[in-house]
Amino acid sequence: MFGRILSSLTILVFALVVGAELAIADDYRPAPGIPDRYGILYDTPIYDPVSKSYFALIWAHKTVYRGTDWQTANAEAMSREYKGIRGRLAVVDSLEIHEFLERTFHPNVDAWIGLRYWCQKRMLEWSNGRIAKRSFQAWDLNWQQDVYACKSGDKNTDFMPVAYTPTDKGFRWIGKGRHKEYFAYFVEFPTGHP
């Protein structure tokens, strides 16, 4: 009897804690089009005339303590639509796009982009399927920051996703393990026009 009561209380406390985390995460969720308390604009597509794409920094908090892994961010980006165009994790293949993202969104958290390193093949691939050229790169000096990157055990499907560091840490690319979670990601809508 006592064991059942204790078990029920444990479940109730767990549910309250998880519910509180979700409520707190939602309380801090900024409204689209309105900068948050740090001046960061989330969930609002902004047009870049150089690339002819819209970009948005997406709020990706699952709870206060949980973010979104790269694969989930990739799927969520592809499920988004703006002006009739499907989204994708952002392809940052030029200095102009890099500077646009930094200047426009200046994130204070790490944020996924549409780049991954295929470990077995030793190649970088963008979310649009193109192989990354060496023409533009924004790697941090300490770019591989995860001892678990490229060590999932499945050599054929193992990859290291790439994210931006916050602007106060240089706004540079870093590689992480597949299961790392971040609180934001960049989505791109390649409309070709405003």
Language-model segments: residues:
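Positively charged n-region of N-terminal signal peptides that target proteins for export
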Residues: 1-5
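Intrinsically disordered, low-complexity segments enriched in Ser/Pro/Gly/Ala and basic residues
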Residues: 6-7, 151
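Extracellular, disulfide-bonded carbohydrate-recognition/adhesion ectodomains
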Residues: 22-194
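Polar helix-capping/helix-linker motif
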Residues: 7-8, 94
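Bacterial N-terminal signal peptides
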Residues: 8-19
